[in-house]
Amino acid sequence: MFKKNINIKIKTKILNLRKKIEMWNNNYYVKNLSLVSDEKYDSTLFELNELEKKYSMFLNTSYSNKIVAKNICNKFKKIKHLSNMLSLESIFNYKNLLNFHEKVKKNLFYNEKRYYCCELKIDGLAINLIYKNGILDSASTRGDGLQGEDVTKNALEIKSIPHILKKNNLSFPKKIEIRGEVFIKLSTFNKINKMLKSKRKKLFSNARNMASGSLRQINPKITKNRSLSFYGYGIGYVNEKKYYYDQHDALKLINSWGIPIEKNTELCKSLNEVKNFYEKSIKIRDYLDFNIDGIVVKVNSMKLQKKLGCSSKYPRWAIAYKFSSEEKCTKILGVNFNVGRTGVITPVAKLKPVYFMGTIIKYSSLHNKDIIDKLGIMINDTVCLKKSGDVIPKISRVIFEKRKNVKEIIFPKTCIFCKSKIEFCLRKKNLYCTGGFLCYAQRKQLLNHFVSREALNIKGMGNKIISQLIEKKIIKYPSDIFKLNTDKIIFLKGMGLKSSENLIKEIIKSKTTELYRVIYGIGIPNVGIYTSMNLANYYKNISNFINTSYEDLRSIKGIGSFTSNCIKKFLKDKRNISIISDLLNVNLKIK
């Protein structure tokens, strides 16, 4: 009886999961609506797959949770694929990758090498191109894997899809399927959304939805105006065996025919190299002009691919290794502006508190105006927070469907702490307060930096002591530190006679120091400890340094034009020269 009840619960769970997947698929692929995050979809699909494996008695052979939608959108005629166009099974951790690797290993021929072709998994829409004698004959979406929607007219409007293949030393096959991904560059996505916003039209929620909706238009002119992009990622059917290339070589072949391919692809000769490629992909994803949600790991050998074959849902020779991340949605209540040590003004979103991965998140950095414009963030927007690994959660996207009563984020024209002039750094895309030590927000951080271990190394003078001294208006500039005595610090919270005497000893000790420590300690923007050492080795004394020229700085190995400009700008400011002079006037001895 107990076992029967358990089975009923399991069956109900499986049926409910199937209904969810079907509903999400239908909305996404037919109506162009994304109801859930990628992570939620993937985790639900993974849960269903695991339950079906474990409880095979409930596996319905007429149901495939990977069929895109029961009804492919009927506004396009259908094209049957020459070879099945299956989706990839998704994995989310190294253990899953190891399991995939072990399954591949079991099917190896004697002494056969286990090479993997690793590619970035572009978050777009799969497309199947059929070329006959080098001329584009048709283009179709993945559809249900057996047949897809005819989008040939629209594909002809995508500049990166060649209408005629380029000739090389190898003649074209009579018939070949070239498969790839249609996507929209993030720069284009933001440009189009900005234009839609100006016309008070509905915005696209993400780049993939825009790409999908743009490819599946009745009017090809709309597709043309959306400036879609395409990368090829492999060959499906080909009518001649001489074109049976291993995956990595197949990419080179189609590229030689004029098919664009993603340039970060690597041939990995070990599982460790695959792991390294995955980790590298995480690091570069924020610098790409298109979205990726993982990597694709393919067995490189065509012979081994054929031996491994496919299940009813997936090829057994490839896997999608997704980036592990979690997502939570919340609301932006307002934006504060923080000023850093070097004057960088950072917008910080004040969020409706949300419990996320063990902590309550109330704030999230927006970094700079470029990021705000790129994501289209406004006050009162509902946004998604994403966290990968141990990285601090960041805002990954805006849910435009929930947008109402929003306000534009207005950047200050003068510093909110000291009213100093604000300047824009084109290279770093940041706004800067020019106040320096005059700015209360910068002063505390600059003085903390000045006494730090790499700079003057004044032991015992931490953040709490400096904060109290600033609040009581005892110190304002670095030279004021060397005017302190026990009478001025003994009454500070946490200080007594002994600790005050010890601190004064450390201050006196630090008055004899090295040139690189002073250069580093005065806090020149974009001048770190190693650059400071480089400068000290070259100039030998403080006088030579403060009287340097731009040309002189550029002649120093390792110091580029940007850093040289930062140094010259700092030394041109009379306030900064005054700070250095004041240090010399309190008998700072620089070796």
From Swiss-Prot:
UniProt keyword annotations, A-Z: DNA damage, DNA repair, DNA replication, Ligase, Magnesium, Manganese, Metal-binding, NAD, Zinc
Q: Which Pfam families match?
A: DNA_ligase_aden, DNA_ligase_OB, HHH_2, HHH_5
InterPro entries the UniProt entry points to: DisA/LigA_HHH (IPR041663), DNA_ligase (IPR001679), DNA_ligase_AS (IPR018239), DNA_ligase_CS (IPR033136), DNAligase_adenylation (IPR013839), DNAligase_N (IPR013840), NA-bd_OB-fold (IPR012340), NAD_DNA_ligase_OB (IPR004150)
Cofactor(s) listed: Mg(2+); Mn(2+)
CDD domains hit by this protein: LIGANc
GO annotation, biological process:
DNA repair; DNA replication
Q: What does the record list as coiled-coil region(s)? A: none
Q: Does the keyword Manganese apply?
A: yes
In terms of superkingdom, the source organism counts as: Bacteria
Residues bound to NAD(+) are D38, E39, K40, Y41, D42, S87, L88, E119, R142, E181, K298, K322
Q: Which family does it belong to?
A: Belongs to the NAD-dependent DNA ligase family. LigA subfamily.
Please give the function described in this protein's UniProt entry: DNA ligase that catalyzes the formation of phosphodiester linkages between 5'-phosphoryl and 3'-hydroxyl groups in double-stranded DNA using NAD as a coenzyme and as the energy source for the reaction. It is essential for DNA replication and repair of damaged DNA.
Record-given protein name: DNA ligase
Q: Which organism is it from?
A: Wigglesworthia glossinidia brevipalpis
Lineage at the top is: Bacteria, Pseudomonadati, Pseudomonadota, Gammaproteobacteria, Enterobacterales
User: Which gene is this protein's source?
Assistant: ligA
